[in-house]
Swiss-Prot record:
Gene designation: argH
Record field: transmembrane: none
Annotated protein name in UniProt: Argininosuccinate lyase
Documented EC number(s): 4.3.2.1
Subcellular locations according to the entry: Cytoplasm
Main location: cytoplasm
GO cellular component: cytosol
An example molecular function term from Gene Ontology annotations: argininosuccinate lyase activity
InterPro entries hit by this protein: Arg_succ_lyase_C (IPR029419), Argininosuccinate_lyase (IPR009049), Fumarase/histidase_N (IPR024083), Fumarate_lyase_CS (IPR020557), Fumarate_lyase_fam (IPR000362), Fumarate_lyase_N (IPR022761), L-Aspartase-like (IPR008948)
């Protein structure tokens, strides 16, 4: 039974009914819809629409319904209804009879779905932040165990300068910290309650909306009824946060795919997060990482899709806005799964420290140190840069590392070069010199790890 049949003389075509109905996906809002209905029952009691006995009966029935639904939201789908709001009201009427028909007084599905979505988004923020913290803890744990694991750092996928695996881990810790704070910021803006805004012009009853907001766990009520039922910024912000974070996770996955390859062999991923080939017995494929990378596009698509949906909508509510749900439900489920699987990938990861060190010693990753050495000897950096470039070209032609060139050959590039150049070209020196805050110096990395642990323990 629809909630709006009085105006119509014909029943909806079954094809349209399926096209229009949303219960098959918005059933996920069952708990939020029930919670909002409990809050609304208290609100209409406060202005005399229902008496105390009716309030008690309504709340008891709604709480009973919540207890029935909470263990498995999908039980909602066992019965037919247009949407989750209709389903909850119909179940309530079954429990309390005509009293259930009073609950919707002064309320529209427009403000009802708006509050449901905000309640749902708020709950997702808290759950996602918990998962992000768990992944950060794994990154810090892995960093702490690999502070001496020297490896090449890359630009343009070319060896650039030596770093440590710990420094690499902490780079992703920082990205996730921004993801965490982005959710915190979004939560502040979604922490306003639209219930009581009616269809668009506000409710006709003198309800204390700020009290209603606080009862539902919001900081305050929204300020404009027209905006309240039209607003989906909270969904967009959550999708934007998800998209940025998924981009970070995809880069994390891509790095590990490269590090795990036979050509790099910097890390070995556990059997628990890899799979084999149906044809090639030797294969051990990084499927967990590849799926994180692959699923990123789904989340990006949800954001761009909703932006396109909302961009041309006149105020206030339009049925187009029903399209906010499937994308956000899938995107958040995907994001949560990718955060969790990324933490699992780190649990048993093995770093081949001999191989990473060997790679760090190749590719002339110490060339910048030679340029800095020349600068310390009074050579302008741009000139030093050119000199070192010539030295690298020569070393490549001789199939030698820079530190393998003899002093006479170094002096052919510039006379200021002396024996003291050789210690400068060592991996230890390369790391030690990067001692400014945020650098790869071992003490700075240890400080970053300590600060991260303190932050995670707060």
């Amino acid at each position: 039974m629809a909630l709006w049949g009085g105006r119509f003389t014909q029943q909806a075509d079954q094809q349209f009914k399926y096209f229009n109905d949303s219960l098959r996906f918005d059933y996920r809002l069952a708990l939020q819809d029930i919670d909002g209905s409990i809050g609304w029952a208290k609100a209409i009691h406060s202005v005399g629409i229902i008496n105390q006995a009716e309030l008690v009966e309504l709340i008891a029935a709604l709480k009973q319904l919540r207890a029935e639904v909470a263990p498995n939201l999908a039980i909602v789908l066992q019965e037919d209804a247009e949407d989750i709001h209709s389903w909850v009201e119909l179940q309530l009427i079954k429990k309390v009879g005509d009293l259930g028909k009073k609950l919707h007084t002064g309320r529209s599905r427009n403000d009802q779905v708006a509050v449901d979505m905000k309640l749902w988004c708020k709950a997702q923020v808290l759950s996602l932040q918990e998962s992000i913290r768990a992944l950060q803890e794994k990154l810090v744990e892995t960093a702490e165990a690999n502070q001496l694991s020297v490896m090449p750092g890359y630009t343009h996928l070319q060896r650039a300068q030596p770093i440590t695996f710990a420094h690499w881990c902490m780079a992703y810790y920082e990205m996730l910290e921004r993801d965490y704070s982005r959710l915190t910021d979004a939560y502040k803006r979604m922490n306003t309650c639209p219930l009581g805004s009616g269809a668009l012009a506000g409710t006709a009853y003198a309800i204390d909306r700020d009290l209603l907001a606080q009862d539902l766990g919001f900081e305050t009520a929204t300020r404009n009824s027209l905006d309240s039922v039209s607003d989906r910024d909270h969904v967009l912000e959550l999708l934007a946060a998800a998209s940025i974070s998924m981009m970070h996770l995809s880069r994390f996955a891509e790095d590990l795919i490269i590090f795990n390859s036979g050509e790099s062999h910097f890390v070995e991923l556990s059997d628990r997060v890899t799979s084999g080939s149906s044809l090639m017995p030797q294969k051990k494929n990084p499927d967990a990482c590849e799926l994180v990378r692959g699923k990123t596009g789904r989340v990006f698509g949800a954001l761009s899709g909703l932006l396109a949906t909302l961009k041309g909508l006149p105020l206030a509510y339009n049925k187009d806005m029903q399209e906010d749900k499937e994308g956000i439900f899938d995107a958040i489920e995907t994001w949560q799964a990718c955060v969790n699987i990324s933490a699992l990938v780190l649990e048993d990861i093995k770093v081949d420290t001999e191989r990473t060190k060997e790679a760090a010693q190749q590719g002339y990753a110490n060339a910048t140190e030679l340029a800095d050495y020349l600068v310390a000897k009074g050579i302008p950096f741009r000139e030093a840069h050119h000199i070192v470039g010539e030295a690298v070209v020569y070393a490549i032609s001789q199939k030698k590392a820079l530190e393998e060139l003899n002093l006479d050959k170094f002096k052919q590039f510039h006379s200021v070069i002396n024996d003291d150049v050789y210690p400068i070209l060592s991996l230890d020196s390369c790391l030690t010199k990067r001692c400014a805050k945020g650098g790869v110096n071992l003490e700075r990395v240890a400080e970053a790890i300590a600060a991260a642990k303190q932050n995670l323990n707060q």
